[in-house]
């Protein structure tokens, strides 16, 4: 079982080396098959990963998470957690807020997120493990992480672009608006913005989760969870936060690029992208390079267009109108 984990990681790393045009840094699974039943071979995977995560599943067992943190601490790697208490989900699929109540939808309570964060922070106190929380969406989560940082715990966190610019008042009866964690209330969105401004939230990550058009065409209840974000993150955040003066451009770049490299010990290198900040356009999923095109931002007027991407000093992408520059 453990041998297969290390072999699979080796296959993944070879595929990255052979096919990726940008740098890709994998995580190792905390538990075998991300099933939450037995710890993975963390020691065997450690040389090839930047941390350990069960991706979109929360580790339900307190003891398993404690042991994972102790072993990750010894290896000098962070635990990267999707926080979710399964027993509190109760079949929900959007935030348990006003929209869910008004339209008869089953809701996901905020405690399903912050309850597991609270448990994990207690385990961080006990183990001294470096700990990173993925896609924070609830105001209570922000408050817990702020308190943990004030106590000196080695904790970082991220949120997603969609949680900063939308809330459950923006929901439509459309699978494009379904993601996990869900879009929460206005107070949650405001707490997240405060969190990026005061340094409680260290990063903004796209949480890019592409699905086919068919998988996202079944309405809020039956569509797959997930939102695409790689191609919309910067223009949406630049338009909604930087242009109105809520956030500086330098701060946005720290949140999107710099802080994650610092946290995970990644080299800065000669990787960068070139943007036309004055380019104004409507987001059209037909223009996406991603095969996943279900975005709640379709039709949104934004500013900021990627002109080119350079990795290791090499041009790996040029916008169609600049294609001849290749």
Predicted regions and their residues:
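Alpha-helix termination/capping residues and helix-transition junctions
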Residues: 18-21, 46, 128, 198, ...
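Active-site beta->alpha loop and helix N-cap motifs at the rims of alpha/beta catalytic domains
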Residues: 28-35
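Divalent metal-coordination and catalytic microenvironments
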Residues: 24, 52, 82, 131, ...
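Short, small-residue-biased leader/transition segments that mark boundaries at the very start
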Residues: 1-2
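Histidine/acidic residue-rich metal-binding segments in metalloenzymes
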Residues: 11, 38-204
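His/Asp/Glu-enriched, well-ordered alpha-helical/loop segment
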Residues: 102-130, 195-198, 202-204, 209-277
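C-terminal cap of metal-dependent C-N hydrolases
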Residues: 219-222, 270-326
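Alpha-helix-loop-beta-strand connector modules within alpha/beta enzyme cores
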Residues: 6-26, 70-81, 230-236
